[in-house]
Amino acid sequence: MSQADLLDQDPVFQLKGSMLAVTILELAHNDLARLERQLADKVAQAPNFFRDTPLVMALDKLPEGEGRLDLPALLEVCRRHGLRTLAIRAGREEDIAAAQALDLPVLPPSGARERPLDIKDSAPRKPAEEPSPSAGEARPEPAKAEEKPADPVSRPTKVVKTPVRGGMQIYAAGGDLIVLAAVSPGAELLADGNIHVYGPMRGRALAGVKGDATARIFCQQLAAELVSIAGNYKVAEDLRRSPQWGKAVHVSLSGDVLNITRL
């Protein structure tokens, strides 16, 4: 076997699934001038957080009747403020065509996978008619099936006992994340459920990353770069204004508002 054959048997790549924290910008109005001003104000609050931030541009919430969207100009506005658009989420044909012309991936609209199937070919079947009982014949009562109580659903909990250093990312899939040590700046915690940090929280904490608005974040010392629940977040510049900065706190979500309270 030649050296070239041996090299061909050594794979040069791997395809892996990964849970990445990607910012979604949901455009509510087709008004690029207003977007430029508001985005500049937001980026000024946390310039380091928004620098080279990967972004999914969501156009599926745009109201009808606001005209054709200038997608290249929209992407340029985001680029000027450090946001790098990876993909477009859209449902309108003109937006999808514009994204494809720019060679941008197009994601399905929010909630598209949850829509019920529309099966048009199958007609409802008519139930078979049962013979009516003759006079004086008693109809037997159907037997009642015993109701079995539902088994309790337990969610797996991921426990980390060592410090989480900058550059590390820890994800608790399907459950809660408990960290029994400090979390350094630049570290990232993600969980489908709650996040508990029994030490200083100086990195990023993203709970309910798959949309669970009931998720919570608990930490003994709030000094985070970012806290997020179900996509609603606050960065360090916002958190420092809170009287709870540096204290033991509980973070919860009410509507679209993050509430930070003392433990």
From Swiss-Prot:
Which keywords does the record carry?
Answer: Cell cycle, Cell division, Septation
Q: Which InterPro entries match?
A: CAP/MinC_C, MinC, MinC_C_sf, MinC_N, Septum_form_inhib_MinC_C
- Identify the domain of life: Bacteria
Q: Which Cys-Cys disulfides exist here?
A: none
Pfam families for this protein = MinC_C, MinC_N
* Cell cycle recorded as keyword: yes
| Compositional bias per record (Basic and acidic residues), positions renumbered to this chain | 112-129, 138-150
Tell me the GO BP annotations in alphabetical order.
Answer: cell morphogenesis; division septum assembly; regulation of cell division; regulation of cell septum assembly
Q: Any keyword Cell division?
A: yes
NCBIfam families named among the record's database cross-references: minC
What is the similarity comment for this entry?
Answer: Belongs to the MinC family.
Q: Which HAMAP family match?
A: MinC (MF_00267)
Q: How does it assemble?
A: Interacts with MinD and FtsZ.
Question: What name has this protein been given in UniProt?
Answer: Probable septum site-determining protein MinC
What taxonomic classification does the UniProt entry list for its organism? Bacteria, Pseudomonadati, Pseudomonadota, Gammaproteobacteria, Pseudomonadales
| Protein encoded by which gene | minC
